[in-house]
Amino acid sequence: MSNRLYTTRRQSIVDALVTKFKDINGTGDFLSNVYGNVSPRLKFWDEVEDFPAIHLNAGSETRDYQGGGYKDRFLSVTIRIYVREEDAVDALDKLLEDVESVVEDNSRLQYTDRQGNVQYTQQITILSIDTDEGVLEPLGVGEILLEVRY
């Protein structure tokens, strides 16, 4: 079998992001504490039992073929964030800020592929941030769309 340089690394990247988001613990510069409620699978708000919670999902993946057999891979990742607070808008804004900070601090994210090799993303870009704007209060739902280049 040949060395698989260009295999998909979807789940490995999502798992590495989950590990980083679990560091949001209300200490230091963090404004929120997720108490480890971070999952590599999306849930809808009516399925979430523990708040606050962060759920991730790997979406579509594309390739950009370069010269010399090199290709860039682009993975879309959806991050859905749930809070239940008296002031859900404020709690959601704080947690969104924490998630954004983790993404920005880890744009060159280290992860391990299926063969056990340490890899790095080239760049993680936030494409959009959206919220329910308080419509579901005391629940709050936010969504961040990422593009991961690896």
Segments (PLM) and residue ranges:
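A broad, low-specificity signal marking well-ordered, structured residues that form hydrophobic/aromatic
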Residues: P52-H55, V77, I124, I144
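Extracellular/virion structural assembly segments
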Residues: G67-F74, V83-N106
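Oligomerization/assembly interface segments of phage tail-like spikes and tubes
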Residues: Y70-E86, L139-Y150
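Residues forming well-ordered secondary-structure scaffolds
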Residues: S12, A16, K94, D98, ...
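Small/polar-rich, solvent-exposed N-terminal microdomains that initiate assembly or binding
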Residues: M1-G67, N106-Q122, L136
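A structural detector for beta-sheet-dominated domains
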Residues: W45, N57-G59, L127-D132, R149
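Glycine-rich, aromatic-bearing surface loops/beta-hairpins
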Residues: I126-L145
